[in-house]
Amino acid sequence: MLKVFKNIFIIFARHTLQFMKKTEKYQLLYEQIKALLGKEKDEIANMANVAAIIHKTFNFWWTGFYRVIDNELVLGPFQGPVACTRIAYGKGVCGTSWKEAQTIVVKDVHEFPGHIACSSASQSEIVVPIFKENQVVAVLDIDSEKLATFDETDKEWLEKIVGLF
């Protein structure tokens, strides 16, 4: 019986989530991630869970992390199709976000100079740097198969979320 109620709750939660405003989703997401990260100290485990929860909440095309290792971005935990494994400093949206140490919102990836097309389905993208001791140590990269998916609301909340690391 408990399993039935749990399944009903999951269905209800998914149904409710699709009718929530973006800001409401992020508020809920932030609190869930904050609680989740408070219990675990392993960064890879945390990145894996954060990628999964963001990906599931918003149904993005690709959600994941690239970590700075030996002066390049190396693929970390992600949700979605196969991705580029390594990205050079200053290259593509991820490398540029790392170089400029700031969030980049791209309404149309085909208009971004030097865009690295890991997937032809990607149409818009947001990349948010993660800082430790004022240095970029990783980036959160999210792609959508729709144009102009990301805006200031995404930027504000995703920066707040990566600030939890």
Label for each model-derived stretch:
Residues 17-77, 160:
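Intrinsically disordered, low-complexity terminal regulatory regions
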Residues 68, 72-118:
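Regulatory sensory and allosteric helical modules in signal-transduction proteins
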Residues 1-4:
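Cationic, amphipathic, low-complexity segments that mediate targeting or membrane/lipid association
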Residues 62, 127, 139:
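Short hydrophobic/aromatic beta-strand element in the GNAT-like acyltransferase core
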Residues 29-30, 34-36, 138, 144-165:
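Juxtadomain coupling helices with adjacent low-complexity linkers
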Residues 6, 10-11, 16:
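Short, positively charged and aromatic/hydrophobic N-terminal segments
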Residues 124-131:
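A short, aliphatic-rich beta-strand micro-motif
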